[in-house]
Amino acid sequence: MNNSLFDLNLNKGVETQKSDLSPQSASVLKTSIKVSKKYCKGVTLTCGCNITGGK
C-alpha cells in the first residue's frame, strides 16, 4: 500500500514538472529570438540579416 502511494506522488511530481517546463521554455525561446535579432542588427554584414528585413 505504501509503495503505491509513493508511486502516485512521484508521478504527480513528474506531471507538475512537465507542465511547468512548457511556458518556461517558451519564454526562454522568445528571449533568445529577441537577443539574436538585436545582435543581428549590429552585425548585418556578417550574418546577412538584411535579407530578413533587419536594419
Swiss-Prot record:
Maturation of this lantibiotic involves the enzymatic conversion of Thr, and Ser into dehydrated AA by ElxB and the formation of thioether bonds with cysteine by the cyclase ElxC. The next steps are cleavage of the leader peptide by ElxP and membrane translocation by ElxT. The leader peptide may be removed before membrane translocation, in contrast to other lantibiotics for which the cleavage occur after translocation. This is suggested by the probable cytoplasmic localization of the serine protease ElxP that cleaves the leader peptide. There is a cross-link at S36-C40 (Lanthionine (Ser-Cys)). The modification D-lactate is found at S25. There is a cross-link at T44-C47, T46-C49 (Beta-methyllanthionine (Thr-Cys)). Residues 1-24 form a propeptide. GO terms for biological process: defense response to bacterium; killing of cells of another organism. The modification 2,3-didehydroalanine (Ser) is found at S27, S32. The modification 2,3-didehydrobutyrine is found at T31, T52. Keywords: Antibiotic, Antimicrobial, Bacteriocin, D-amino acid, Lantibiotic, Thioether bond. The keyword Nucleotide-binding does not apply. The keyword Membrane does not apply. One of its GO terms (molecular function) is signaling receptor binding. It comes from the Bacteria. Belongs to the type A lantibiotic family. Lanthionine-containing peptide antibiotic (lantibiotic) active on Gram-positive bacteria such as staphylococci, enterococci and streptococci. The bactericidal activity of lantibiotics is based on depolarization of energized bacterial cytoplasmic membranes, initiated by the formation of aqueous transmembrane pores. This is Lantibiotic epilancin. The gene is elkA.
